[in-house]
């Protein structure tokens, strides 16, 4: 993740590499946040700039980097990773919409209980076509954005769609 070191007013990337492809995609994604934070500084009181713009830069960086996948990983792996990028984009759009709808419904409830929150999530989880597993109704708890940045998740959805349009444009020009 990328954060701001407010004492220095500088962005900083925190990454725990594990030797996989995700080291590359992680640093590329976070570098998009870094550039955004560097160009449009955030502050301790008001936080980050527009989330959709931050995510557009990060997801955009990921897709721009696919141009070098073959050189970095070889042709077979490059194709697989490109397909993985597109698959993750579909997931970003679906999850972004689902989590936004989830939070809208949660915040609209009058007498909310933790059981009701889990029920709402379970309903939406199934409605969005996800595979049910033991404990899926509590999956929302493991998403930090639900607590520290409510309604952030729609940013992934809103950023992915124009980025895919730009990526398509890059491929034809």
Mark where each language-model region is.
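Cation-handling catalytic/transport regions enriched in His/Asp/Glu
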Residues: 1-173
